[in-house]
């Protein structure tokens, strides 16, 4: 599997399962309606586990532009690959969100509240305060990326090659990373919905705005959209700088 395709496919799978549980909890007349935050955070952790297991051997399973930036700043990933990885991740997020809509189309139609429908695509804060919201995303992503540096190696041996290649996160322990995302969601996610991943938010938000906004009568809330993009990039950069400084 090509590394770029792996990032696309893995991110699409991540969003299908992750935003899928949000739709199951938030939309009307689903079997999981109103089952709560614990269900959402747990399923997101499982989604991370599944996506990482599938794509780890092929691309390092970044599945997150902030992780890609952080690993590159750490010096464990080629800057030449960064644009392609990020593009693949964002497009994967768009496709995953479209699949969620197809799966839950009737339930979207049965739901009138705009905020509930938008939540199935992208994040929004519980209390809108942009500086604090930005700090929340920075801190959450800092924890994610900094701990990932301790959980995984820097290199990966690609199929068909004999040498270790600095292509991504390496031979990844998917379960610890999933538990890490679960912990972030439970502890820090209640403020902004813990995007901690620009592709997780921007990709589905683009799908909503470009293809589904009129059908769902739901706006993409572009006024907030910069927070779950800028915040994770800052958090990842700080994690890389701090890790390099102390190691």
Locations of regions flagged by a protein language model:
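Membrane-interface helix-loop junctions and terminal tails of multi-pass membrane proteins
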Residues: 1-247
């Amino acid at each position: 599997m090509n590394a770029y395709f792996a990032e696309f496919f893995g991110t699409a799978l991540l969003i299908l399962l992750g935003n899928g549980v949000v739709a199951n909890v938030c939309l009307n007349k689903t079997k999981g309606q109103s089952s709560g935050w614990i269900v959402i955070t747990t399923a997101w952790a499982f989604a991370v586990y599944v996506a990482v297991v599938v794509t780890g051997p092929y691309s390092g399973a970044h599945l997150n532009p902030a992780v890609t930036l952080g690993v590159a700043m750490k010096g464990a990933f080629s800057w030449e690959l960064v644009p392609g990885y990020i593009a693949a991740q964002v497009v994967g997020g768009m496709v995953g969100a479209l699949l969620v809509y197809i799966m839950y189309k009737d339930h979207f139609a049965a739901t009138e509240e705009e905020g509930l429908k938008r939540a199935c695509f992208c994040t929004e804060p519980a209390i809108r305060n942009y500086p604090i919201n930005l700090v929340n995303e920075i801190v959450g992503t800092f924890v994610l990326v900094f701990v990932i540096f301790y959980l995984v190696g820097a290199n990966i041996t690609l199929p068909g090659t004999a040498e270790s290649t600095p292509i991504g996160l390496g031979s990844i322990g998917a379960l610890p990373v999933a538990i890490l995302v679960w912990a972030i969601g439970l502890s820090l996610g209640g403020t902004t919905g813990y995007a901690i991943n620009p592709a997780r938010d921007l990709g589905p938000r683009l799908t909503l705005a470009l293809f589904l906004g009129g059908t769902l009568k739901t706006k993409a809330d572009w006024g907030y959209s910069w927070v779950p993009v800028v915040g994770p990039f800052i958090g990842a950069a700080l994690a890389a700088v701090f890790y390099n400084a102390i190691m």
